[in-house]
Amino acid sequence: MKIIYVDLDGVVADFDKGRSEHPLSGVTPYIGRPDKLPGVYENLAPIPNAIESVNKLLKDSNFKVYFLSTAPWDNPEAWMHKRLWVAKHF
């Protein structure tokens, strides 16, 4: 069995779109630090076809799939929101 690590941001979750549409994205102190935007990870849209692609891997017994991501240490809600995002979509 092969192991596959799947990143979230920019791979299956559209962080760039979520960042640009966030109401505080142009407000100090978030300029240049979009990862600190409150709730930015909570409602990210999936990247087109990403969910279907990962689901194919999850159903294939030849692969063990793990989601691999990180969040800023000083944005503790980001860890929870990323976990909830995975649970919602997979």
PLM ranges: what are they?
Residues 1-44:
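Active-site neighborhood of HAD-like aspartate-dependent phosphohydrolases
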Residues 29-30, 82-84:
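General N-terminal targeting signals
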Residues 45, 50-80, 86:
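Substrate-recognition element of Asp-dependent hydrolases with the DxDx(T/V) motif
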Residues 88-90:
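Short, intrinsically disordered, charge-balanced linker/junction segments flanking boundaries
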